[in-house]
Amino acid sequence: NNYWDYGGDAIIDTNRYVMLTQDRRNETGWLWSRLPIEANDFEITSEFVMKGKSTTTGGDGFAMWLTTTRAQPGPVFGSMNRWNGLGIIFDTFPNQPHRGFFPRISVVENDGTKTYNTDSDGEKQDLAQCAMQLRHTPAETRLRFTYVKDVYMELAIQNQEWNQWNKCFRIPPVNLPGPPYLGFSASTGEVTDTHSIVSVWTNKIVYNSRTPADLDKEREQAFADDKSSHWWAIHQKKEARRAHEHGLISYMLIRFFISLAWLIKWLVILALVAGGSFVG
């Protein structure tokens, strides 16, 4: 194929699917685009299948990647750790007890320096998450990821009825290190599943020229129904936290210099007293 590479344990059934892993232990496979996504605003839709002999338990899961590097196998669902970009992780098996349900979908940003903790399933490392049934579903499972720069990014899942989309998250967008490559990877361990990518569509979203005021209005509309995830609410919290941190640093510096001045003062006094005693 001129547009995709695959590797690891991945198997291609031409014109049907790419099977990233079979329902076997300790397999990893990947599928990566050869060309990066050049568009600022885009939408990715993919049909995928996760199934196995067990109707109740499967593992480990798969991930969709938007990163600066491509086709680098590793320990995070078949792909490298410390990636630079965005990972959307479809985790079907908990490696430790968690509050909430599995399968769990989480979105994780990395700048290439942070280690994703697979033992804790990335606990407290995600930007957003949701739990949805992804195995043995009534309808074909599809994901739809929408990225509108400076406005929002959203993941929706089809799993119950055809063309009925359930929102997993809609949050302010990260700044993608661009242009990113699109990839999929999967892995199995002691618990197994077949992980297949049936189809992938990537579409550029085209807008007319927009002013800063237009972007403000789009943000307001994007988060109008979710005040907790409102763009400006999050922005204001970040600014307040930054101001608090800066204020705390300034306070600590002032205390340091006051303490230093106090120490110098008493050292001088002690030196004078000691000198007077010596002369006397």
Where is each model-derived feature located?
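Polar, low-complexity loop segments and adjacent catalytic/binding residues used for recognizing
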Residues: N1-G280
